[in-house]
């Protein structure tokens, strides 16, 4: 079977991971998102959905669908519930990422397979990938981006960031570090350079 290079994009909250993935997609890569995958199978009447309800309670379901804000309100200030939710979701996310990888090979039209996995190191999934890109930005810039995009508070930013591994540990493990303290155009140029470097190495 043809082997397609597996690349993961990771980084802290509001560092620019999704923007980087969009550039890869525009350049022809097969791109998947761990967050989008987890949202796609969070359906109340599925096996995974029932496990989530058993953990968090039926009040996280509103009008027949999971309420993201209700889930967040329960887990972000309760580490036991958060760990329980992640134990349910993360294995399924990894399984689907790997299914998508094999699908991308079967399709045969892609130069790279790219997965956005925010908690890549936290769930010990980095070794599955051939290369890891760590997207970084200064904390004050990330905080401003987060608050502007979500309308949430600075305290929410801090609480969500507490889930992430220390940045020094990530720096020690990443294959490539992309700084994203500037404009979108500058980020696009950096990702394009890495895309063509990877293609050239194949």
From Swiss-Prot:
Q: Show the InterPro entries listed in the entry.
A: Depp_CoAkinase (IPR001977), P-loop_NTPase (IPR027417)
Keywords assigned by UniProt? ATP-binding, Coenzyme A biosynthesis, Cytoplasm, Kinase, Nucleotide-binding, Transferase
| Domain DPCK as annotated: residue spans | 6-202
One of this protein's GO BP terms?
Answer: coenzyme A biosynthetic process
- Principal localisation: cytoplasm
Q: What cellular component GO annotations does this protein have? A: cytoplasm
Its biological purpose is as follows: Catalyzes the phosphorylation of the 3'-hydroxyl group of dephosphocoenzyme A to form coenzyme A.
- Name of the featured protein: Dephospho-CoA kinase
Instruction: Please tell me the species this chain comes from.
Output: Chlamydia pneumoniae (Chlamydophila pneumoniae)
Q: What is the lineage of its organism?
A: Bacteria, Pseudomonadati, Chlamydiota, Chlamydiia, Chlamydiales
